Amino acid sequence: MKKKTGILFLVLLIMALTVCMSGCSGSDALPQAAEDEIKLMIQLNLKEDIGLLILDNNLDGAETSGGISNADKSLLKHDDLLDWTLSKQEYENPADAVNLSVRFRVITEYCDPNYENDYPEEYTVLLDPISFEAEFGTTYHITITGDRENGYQAALDK
């Protein structure tokens, strides 16, 4: 009787662990764009941490600007994966496929974010823009590499 109870307990324990391991662990899937969004997944591959990342976007002639920073004022880690979304409702009747140009600005030291995206020149590094045809409902992957000494580069991953 004790042997059957022990086996039953072991089977139940294995089943519980299996369910927990498959259902309790979070999904490793990257966020996907909704049908009315263009999602940019920006992988930092830098030699040092940075203060902020500013994005100046031109979507079929409509210009917007924004930035990414940590709410706790800590630096963005050199290997962070950042998520940036362009929503269709922010633009006036865009087509499903648009010409998108993104110019990144790396702010090397933390500065308080501001609506004008105006930061000290000595901390600001302007990257060459990347341009491509983008479709709403699609996620694009961009990698930013480099360092303060040699400069930074942004590239659309294929």
Segments from the language model and where they lie:
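C-terminal motif of bacterial Sec signal peptides marking the signal peptidase cleavage site
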Residues: 19-23
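Short, low-complexity, Pro/Ser/Thr/Gly-rich segments in the mature regions of secreted, periplasmic
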Residues: 146-158
